[in-house]
């Protein structure tokens, strides 16, 4: 859900026609964005997708915990991937806007305790994040019992913020070092 309408959400009819056309080749659907939980009618769309027989993964930033709880309680999701933008103590820095951290924590706790598959992930943006930011997020998640934390590496392509096009991607060596260090945090 992400384009075509003024509110940024796709026309449900188009989505359903497309899925029905290709359903013999498709087993699962990822609902992504923007932020799909702000789209009106999301639950209705997911219910229809479920009736087609497809599994559903939701990508979310966690800003709408009540919507997330409703979708989970209705059995409309099979997997949730939530972006953790950075350490919660300075979350607005990583989002570019102030965010109610309680919503983020509420969504995080809902996902951890909901009984379906999940992962948390942070996109590392050089110059915005430090390595210590990632270690802080990893330690926070480990203490909550999370086992599935992924780091994504920022790529300067199709960015909403033009200045981000000038950011140099993380070197392979740095990425491997960070992945190894984060992995050690999750070792028991």
Where are the regions a protein language model picked out?
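Short, charge-patterned binding micro-sites
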Residues: 34
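Conserved AdoMet/S-adenosylmethionine-binding subsite of the radical SAM
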Residues: 16-28, 37-164
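A short acidic, glycine-rich active-site loop
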Residues: 4-6, 91-101, 169-173
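Canonical Radical SAM [4Fe-4S] cluster-binding loop centered on the CxxxCxxC motif
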Residues: 1-14
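Electropositive phosphate-/nucleotide-binding environments in soluble metabolic enzymes
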Residues: 9-12, 131, 172
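Short acidic, glycine/proline-enriched helix-loop-strand junctions
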Residues: 104-105, 118, 159-188
């Amino acid at each position: 859900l992400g384009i075509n309408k003024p509110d940024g959400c796709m026309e449900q009819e188009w989505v359903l026609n497309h899925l029905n056309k290709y359903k013999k080749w498709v087993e699962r659907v990822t609902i992504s964005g923007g932020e799909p939980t702000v789209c009106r009618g999301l639950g209705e769309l997911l219910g229809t997708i479920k009736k087609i027989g497809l599994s559903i993964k939701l990508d979310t930033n966690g800003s709408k915990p009540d919507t997330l709880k409703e979708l989970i309680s209705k059995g409309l999701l099979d997997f949730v991937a939530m972006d953790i933008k950075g350490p919660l103590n300075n979350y607005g820095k990583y989002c570019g806007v102030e965010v109610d951290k309680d919503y983020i924590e509420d969504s995080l706790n809902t996902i951890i305790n909901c009984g379906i598959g999940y992962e948390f992930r942070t996109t590392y943006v050089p110059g915005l994040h430090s390595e210590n930011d990632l270690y802080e997020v990893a330690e926070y998640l480990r203490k909550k019992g999370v086992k599935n934390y992924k780091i994504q590496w920022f790529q300067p392509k199709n960015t909403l913020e033009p200045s981000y096009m000038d950011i140099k991607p993380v070197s392979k060596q740095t990425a491997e070092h960070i992945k190894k260090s984060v992995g050690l945090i999750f070792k028991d």
